[in-house]
Amino acid sequence: MRQNQLIEKITNEQLRTDIPDFRAGDTVRVHARVVEGTRERIQLFEGVVIKRHGSGISETYTVRKISNGVGVERTFPLHTPRVAAIDVVRQGRVRRAKLYYLRNLHGKAARIPERRRG
């Protein structure tokens, strides 16, 4: 077995299959596992996906939310075991793959219309 095939086999075993289909503009709730000392707990992070980056085992996504009037962005690896679950709260209708322009918008201007299902 060549090295490329071996790496591909190992990464395919580590890919998660329980990830819902979501894209930039969707509002998601990420259940992140946080270790504090000897205890482990679930911390929720709900916000708008502003980008997805990469492919395969190294794919990441960035979620943005406003907390106490301050914009907070957090980047998660898609296939990490540190994320217990990802819930899609609502699907947004956007025309871009990267929503960096949301960083400069405030209030109602930063809202994303909901995508129609059909």
UniProtKB/Swiss-Prot annotation:
| Name recorded for this polypeptide | Large ribosomal subunit protein bL19
- Pfam families per the record? Ribosomal_L19
Keyword field: Ribonucleoprotein, Ribosomal protein
Q: What does this protein do?
A: This protein is located at the 30S-50S ribosomal subunit interface and may play a role in the structure and function of the aminoacyl-tRNA binding site.
Per the UniProt entry, what are the Gene Ontology biological process annotations, in alphabetical order?
translation
Q: Which GO terms describe its molecular function?
A: structural constituent of ribosome
InterPro entries found in the cross-reference section: Ribosomal_bL19, Ribosomal_bL19_CS, Ribosomal_bL19_sf, Translation_prot_SH3-like_sf
Tell me which GO cellular component terms the UniProt record holds: cytosolic large ribosomal subunit
Q: Which organism is it from?
A: Lactiplantibacillus plantarum (strain ATCC BAA-793 / NCIMB 8826 / WCFS1)
Record Gene3D superfamilies: 2.30.30.790
Q: What SUPFAM superfamilies does the annotation carry? A: Translation proteins SH3-like domain (SSF50104)
Q: Family per UniProt?
A: Belongs to the bacterial ribosomal protein bL19 family.
